């Protein structure tokens, strides 16, 4: 049964009183009851714009043409935002859970019964009376999903729902999503760069390019088409699929590490997964950040967010910082930059430090990107950086735009451009690739490596472990307020079970003789 139909949809944003930007052109597709449809494409292709147009209350301001027919209407269509913070409005979890239902005038006895039943079903009873601000990012996103389910939706629209979640929270969220889809027969439309998670679950893939649909259909044909035609987007495909293709595979694409191993012969395994790990030799360089016995808390009588922290970071290296949501990673960056201070311990840092905030919107103050950049750099310096690296090749066309009007990936690139105008020697990056497609990640990776060669020290906080394995010299694991592990990324990911990569997981399996025997 068809539950959603879009015919010849066109949409343009108003840039000013006379100019418009054509974001979507001739969009036509339909969705069947219970389907999961994955929308994907390079940054700025129009995924989020399309998703928002399907939910009447949050449609962006602009000119829309064409037809959108929703069998269930907007009231039974829930929208989950990328940023967990963006959707929460109440003080406690219990208040947030019923907030939407209250606004729909659900009878109080029905609302109380539904809240109790849903909390038990999702396993969130223990956090009902907690403050929403005390929750981790993963808990907030699960609460957002629960709040939507309270309103008994038939269709869910998800905009990069796990991009800001750590691996464990992502696993929990995906399991819950599968559960509610199967139990309630929900129809799910998701816009996502992380195809590793959603492509295996998708019934249909819609690939967008420059505001148009370039492909819609089954995922097997989609993967084959990407390898044949869309070279840029290949970087966004699941790691297992790329490795299988590298080994010569062309069909029956594996989405799990164990499935990939079984599909490869012994010689292919040796080529793709050599036994040698990265050597942890000294890379030299000058110590640019030193912490000994650092303690930090937000309130005088509160708990320590960082405690007995020791850390030494050196020039000419790239470090990855990982850990769970709420572990204190962003707090540590704010202390390093001087926004906050340890109340006990020793801290020394060289000058010339810059921070890319987790929310790139915080990097901008003016109405145009050019005005923002002119606050800290000359026109000559702006022009120099525009021509310096291919990562910034499309930034020039955004200079006259309000940076807050850019897509998530475009805003991320614009924020990186702005902070690099000062040519910092120490660069702190908080989730820098969360809104970038695979191709943009690869170009950004090469930019960071060139900066490393110039002697820069770069600390990258990210939940994208595949990216960290390729870019970082060492990974630091922040747990319980201190660095619990620090070693070469390849070695760490082989030893880890949850905070790991596809290659790390497979190398760990290949070291397990019982697994290979079976």
List each language-model region with its residue ranges:
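A short, surface-exposed alpha-helical micro-motif characterized by mixed small hydrophobic
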Residues: 198-200, 468-470
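Conserved beta-strand-loop-alpha-helix hinge in the C-terminal portion
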Residues: 212-240, 482-505
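Conserved ABC ATPase "signature" region
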Residues: 110-127, 382-398
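Catalytic Walker B motif of ABC-type/P-loop ATPase nucleotide-binding domains
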Residues: 156-159, 427-430
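Conserved ABC ATPase signature
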Residues: 131-135, 402-406, 410
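H-loop/switch region of ABC-family ATPase nucleotide-binding domains
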Residues: 192-193, 462-463
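The feature captures the beta-strand-to-loop junction immediately N-terminal to the Walker
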Residues: 40-42, 322-324
């Amino acid at each position: 049964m068809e539950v959603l139909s879009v015919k010849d949809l066109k949409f343009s944003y108003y840039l000013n009183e006379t100019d418009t930007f054509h974001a979507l052109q001739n969009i036509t597709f339909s969705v069947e009851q219970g389907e999961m449809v994955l929308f994907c494409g390079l940054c700025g292709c129009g995924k989020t714009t399309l998703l928002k147009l399907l939910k009447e209350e949050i449609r962006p301001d602009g000119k829309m043409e064409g037809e959108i027919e929703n069998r269930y209407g907007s009231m039974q269509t829930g929208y989950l935002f990328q940023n967990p913070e963006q959707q929460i409005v109440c003080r406690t979890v219990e208040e947030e859970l019923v907030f939407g239902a209250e606004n729909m005038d659900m009878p109080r006895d029905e609302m109380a019964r539904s809240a109790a039943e849903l909390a038990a079903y999702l396993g969130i009873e223990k956090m009902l009376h907690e403050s929403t601000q005390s929750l981790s990012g993963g808990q907030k996103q699960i609460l957002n999903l629960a709040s939507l389910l309270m309103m008994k939706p038939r269709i869910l629209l998800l905009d990069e729902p796990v991009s800001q979640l750590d691996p464990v929270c992502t696993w929990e969220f995906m399991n819950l999503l599968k559960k509610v889809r199967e139990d309630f027969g929900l129809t799910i439309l998701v816009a996502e760069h992380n195809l590793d998670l959603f492509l295996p679950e998708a019934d249909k893939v819609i690939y967008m390019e420059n505001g148009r649909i370039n492909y819609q259909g089954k995922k097997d044909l989609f993967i084959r088409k990407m390898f044949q035609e869309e070279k840029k987007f290949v970087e966004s495909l699941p790691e297992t699929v790329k490795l299988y293709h590298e080994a010569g595979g062309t069909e029956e694409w594996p989405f799990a590490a164990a499935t990939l191993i079984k599909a490869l012969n012994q010689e292919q395994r040796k080529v793709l997964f050599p036994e040698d790990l990265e050597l942890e030799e000294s890379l030299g360089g000058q110590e640019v950040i030193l912490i000994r016995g650092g303690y930090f808390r937000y309130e005088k009588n509160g708990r320590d967010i960082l405690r007995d922290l020791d850390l030494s970071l050196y020039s000419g290296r790239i470090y990855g910082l990982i850990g769970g949501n709420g572990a204190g990673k962003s707090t540590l960056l704010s202390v390093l930059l001087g926004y906050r201070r340890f109340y006990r311990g020793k801290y020394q840092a060289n000058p010339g430090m810059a921070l890319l905030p987790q929310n790139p919107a915080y990097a901008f103050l003016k109405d145009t990107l050019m005005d923002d950049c002119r606050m800290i750099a000359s026109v000559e310096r702006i022009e120099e950086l525009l021509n310096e690296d291919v990562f910034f090749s499309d930034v020039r066309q955004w200079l006259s735009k309000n940076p807050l009007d850019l897509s998530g990936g475009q805003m991320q690139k614009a924020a990186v451009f702005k902070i690099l105008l000062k040519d910092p020697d120490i660069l702190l990056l908080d989730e820098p690739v969360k809104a970038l497609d695979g191709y943009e990640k690869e170009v950004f990776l090469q930019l960071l490596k060139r900066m490393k060669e110039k002697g820069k020290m770069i600390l990258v906080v990210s939940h994208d472990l595949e990216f960290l394995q390729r870019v970082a010299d060492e990974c630091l694991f922040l747990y319980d307020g201190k660095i619990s592990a620090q070693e070469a990324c390849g070695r760490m990911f082989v030893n880890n079970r949850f905070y790991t990569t596809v290659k790390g997981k497979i190398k760990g399996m290949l070291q397990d003789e019982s697994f290979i025997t079976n």
